[in-house]
Amino acid sequence: MNSAHNKNETTFQRSMKSRHLFMLSLGGVIGTGLFLSSGYTIQQAGPAGTILAYLVGAGIVYLVMLCLGELSVAMPVTGAFHTYAAKYIGPGTGFTVAWLYWLTWTVALGSEFTAAGLLMQRWFPHTSVWMWSAVFALFIFLLNAFSVKFFAESEFWFSSIKVLAIVLFILLGGSAMFGIIPIKGGEAAPMLSNFTAEGGLFPNGFVPILMTMLSVNFAFSGTELIGIAAGESVDPDKTIPKAIKTTVWRLSLFFVGTIFVLSGLIPIQDAGVIKSPFVAVFDRVGVPYAADIMNFVILTAILSAANSGLYASSRMLWSLSKEKTLHPTFAKLTSKGTPFNALVFSMIGGILSLLSSVFAPDTVYVVLVSISGFAVVVVWMGIAASQFMFRKRYIEAGNKVTDLKYRTPLYPFVPIAAFLLCLASVVGIAFDPNQRIALYCGVPFMAICYAIYYVKNRKSQPAADMTHSK
């Protein structure tokens, strides 16, 4: 199995550097949720509660990324955690993880193309949403189809715009909070008064904080893209650890800093009803054309997430095909090293998702969105379990841990803690009426994936043959 991978990996272009991996991960994580939904989160959990939830979420994702780092450096293959799960947990689990992750991103593609079309109507009110959706879908497809280097460079600049907007927001908003720069209209600097007003730091108690933690895990989804890109990165033993370290701490800074400034400048009773809290803050500090600037930033955020999503979903199909669990046509690469057939199929999936949001928004689309939200945490659990089993079998095979170029620290505590914390998030979904449907849809979908795999492969070689140590 390893030899097959190594033979094929030479056909992929190892073009991604550490800066590309870092921005690819940011591109998948920082989406419209931070720019549009953060005010609602603050209203539900309170200022301190939201910050606490994001800090805990960052801790969980850091544990998961430590596990992914060891796996990705030891086995830098395109497909990443699908391949690891198939090898170290079981082929049925690998198959299920791959389809869960593919569905997550293809569902996101549909909603992102629709949202991009709606945003363009601010500047072109008499044009069709669907025209813009088609234009952006073609644009994203071409970025991915041309070459890996072209994709990585475009994602770097997409993500750079988002990061610049967040950094400016934190600097300008923080300065206005503490009176360093004036607030429009001569209003006094609020300092930290909004943190203690309207019920204090935790105005709604601790239960809403727990519910916020569940959604915060989903907010951090996308960091695992670093693992998928391992097979196409330069010097993965150096670039992956560096990308993981910078991604997690900077994401934590961006998320927590944003929530801190929003909480300081927008009273909690207003936070949940403001359409775009970023626009509200930029407007208060006197930034001209704040609404248009943020419309552009959110548009790039959407296109960045779509760009990352099409990349991730196509690589999952390629990996499934290389593992002989999907038709071999999806493993074919162009002369530039891109899986064109997998890209086309993933784009079709995104378009079907878009159509379901139009023609069956309360049935098919709700089910798809629910499964995709549930899938992220399940994939993280798979990463933690894979690393636990990898290290165990690595040692059993007589290898030395010191020979690993990147080692997950505090083994086995880190993978066990990551797995249990993710499991707690999944269990917690059952107690939130708004998210419970994710379990009702996600668990049956997993069962169907397992059933399909074992029906198709009941005559294939035993799973034990696929779990030999590296």
From Swiss-Prot:
UniProt keyword Cytoplasm, yes or no: no
MF annotations from Gene Ontology: amino acid transmembrane transporter activity
Transmembrane segments: 22-42, 48-68, 89-109, 128-148, 163-183, 200-220, 254-274, 285-305, 340-360, 364-384, 411-431, 437-457
Primary location class: membrane
Bilayer topology term: Multi-pass membrane protein
GO biological process: amino acid transmembrane transport
Domain of life according to the entry: Bacteria
Keywords: Amino-acid transport, Cell membrane, Membrane, Transmembrane, Transmembrane helix, Transport
GO cellular component: membrane; plasma membrane
Protein known as: Uncharacterized amino acid permease YbgF
Gene3D superfamilies to which the protein is assigned, alphabetical: Amino acid/polyamine transporter I
Family: Belongs to the amino acid-polyamine-organocation (APC) superfamily.
Compartments in which it is found: Cell membrane
